[in-house]
C-alpha cells in the first residue's frame, strides 16, 4: 500500500516537474534548409590568432539580417483582454 502511494506521488511529481520546466521557454529558430546563410567573417587582430602555417584566422558566424521582434508567449496561457 505504501509503495503504491509513494510511486504514484513520485510519478505526479515527475510529471509536474517536466511540465513546468518546459513551460515558457522559447523554441529555437528553425534553420532554413533550402537557403544558404551568408557568413560574416572578421579577422582577429591579435598575434596569437595564427594557425600552425602562420595564416591569420577568421572568426566566421552566420550574419543576422534583420532582428525580428518576437513575442514571448507562454504555452497554454489565456490571452489578456
Curated annotation (Swiss-Prot):
Report the coiled-coil segments: none
This chain is glycosylated at: 48
List the GO biological process terms.
Answer: defense response to fungus; defense response to Gram-positive bacterium; G protein-coupled receptor signaling pathway; lymphocyte chemotaxis; mast cell degranulation; negative regulation of cell cycle G1/S phase transition; negative regulation of cell division; regulation of keratinocyte proliferation
Query: What is the annotated signal peptide range for this record?
Result: 1-24
Q: Which InterPro entries match?
A: GPR15L
Ordered alphabetically, the record's keywords are: Antibiotic, Antimicrobial, Chemotaxis, Cytokine, Disulfide bond, Glycoprotein, Secreted, Signal, Tumor suppressor
Please describe the organ and tissue distribution of this protein's expression: Expressed at high levels in colon, and cervix and at moderate level in tonsil. Highly reduced expression in primary colon cancer tissues compared with that in adjacent tissues. Highest levels of expression detected in stomach and colon; expressed in epithelium of skin and esophagus, and in some tumor and/or tumor adjacent tissues (TAT), including TAT of esophagus cancer, hepatocellular carcinoma (HCC), squamous cell carcinoma (SCC), basal cell carcinoma (BCC) and invasive ductal carcinoma (IDC) tissues (at protein level). Highly expressed by inflammatory differentiated keratinocytese.
What Pfam families does this protein map onto? Answer: GPR15L
GO cellular-component term (any): extracellular region
- Please name every pair of cysteines joined by a disulfide bond in this record: 40-63, 41-60
Where is it localised? Secreted
Q: Which domain of life is it from?
A: Eukaryota
Give the induction text: Up-regulated in the skin of psoriasis and atopic dermatitis patients.
Q: MF terms per GO, please? A: chemokine activity; G protein-coupled receptor binding; receptor ligand activity
Q: What does this protein do?
A: Highly cationic protein that has multiple functions. Acts as a chemotactic factor that mediates lymphocytes recruitment to epithelia through binding and activation of the G-protein coupled receptor GPR15. May be a tumor suppressor; together with SUSD2 has a growth inhibitory effect on colon cancer cells which includes G1 cell cycle arrest. May regulate keratinocyte proliferation. In addition, through activation of Mas-related G protein-coupled receptors (MRGPRs) contributes to pruritogenesis by activating itch-selective sensory neurons and mast cells degranulation.
Q: Note the subunit structure.
A: Interacts with SUSD2; the interaction is direct.
Q: How is this protein named in the record? A: Protein GPR15LG
Question: What is the species listed in this Swiss-Prot or TrEMBL entry?
Answer: Homo sapiens (Human)
Amino acid at each position: 500500500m505504501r509503495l503504491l502511494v509513494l510511486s504514484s506521488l513520485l510519478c505526479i511529481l515527475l510529471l509536474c516537474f517536466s511540465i513546468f520546466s518546459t513551460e515558457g521557454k522559447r523554441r529555437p529558430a528553425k534553420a532554413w534548409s533550402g537557403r544558404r546563410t551568408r557568413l560574416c567573417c572578421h579577422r582577429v587582430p591579435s598575434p596569437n590568432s595564427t594557425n600552425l602555417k602562420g595564416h591569420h584566422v577568421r572568426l566566421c558566424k552566420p550574419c543576422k539580417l534583420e532582428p525580428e521582434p518576437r513575442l514571448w508567449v507562454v504555452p497554454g496561457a489565456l490571452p489578456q483582454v
